[in-house]
Amino acid sequence: MSTEQVEIHEVKIEVPDKVKVSEKHRILNVEGPLGKTRKNFKKIPVDLKVESKSIVIKSLGTRKKDYAIFKTAESLVNTLIKGVQTGYTFKMKIVYAHFPITVKIKDGNIHVENFQGERAPRVSKIFGDTKVVAKGDDVVITGPVLTDVSQTAASLQQNTKVKNKDSRVFLDGIYLFEKHDGIEK
C-alpha cells in the first residue's frame, strides 16, 4: 500500500478576446459573436473558477474516475467557447423513391410533408437558438450550441425513420451526411 500523495489535476483554459465568460452558482455563462450559451456544472464534481481571461478547472480527487470527469468538464468548456466563436453546421440529405418529401419550417418546428404519401406532416422540434434552412434536397442546421444542433438533427432523422418495412429496400428519410465546425454563409 502506497502512502504517496498523487497530484490533483488542474487545467487553465484561455478565453479569447471576443468571448465573455461568467460563473454564478456553478452555472457557466459564455457569450460570443454568434450568441450566448450556458452550462450547469452543479452535478459535475469539479472545481470551476473564472479568472480574468481564463477558466481554471480542478479535479476533486485523484482516482481514474475523477480524471475522466475532469477531462469531460474540460471538453465541455472548450466546446462552449468554440461554439460561440465559430458555431456548428450539420448537413442532412432528403432521400425519397416515389413520394417527394417537402420540408417546411413553421413556428420553431420542422414539418416533413408527404413522407411516404402520408397526409399529416411529421413534426420535429428545433432546439435552442438553432437555425434550420431547407434548400432543395438538403437541410442545413446551424447554431452556436453543439448539443442543440445535434439534437435537432437527431430528432429530424428519427422522425423520418421507416417502420414495419425492410430498411434495405425502403430508404426514404432525412439522413445526416456532413458535420463540421463553423457556420457557412
Model region roles, listed by residue range:
Residues 1-185:
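Ribosome-associated RNA-binding proteins
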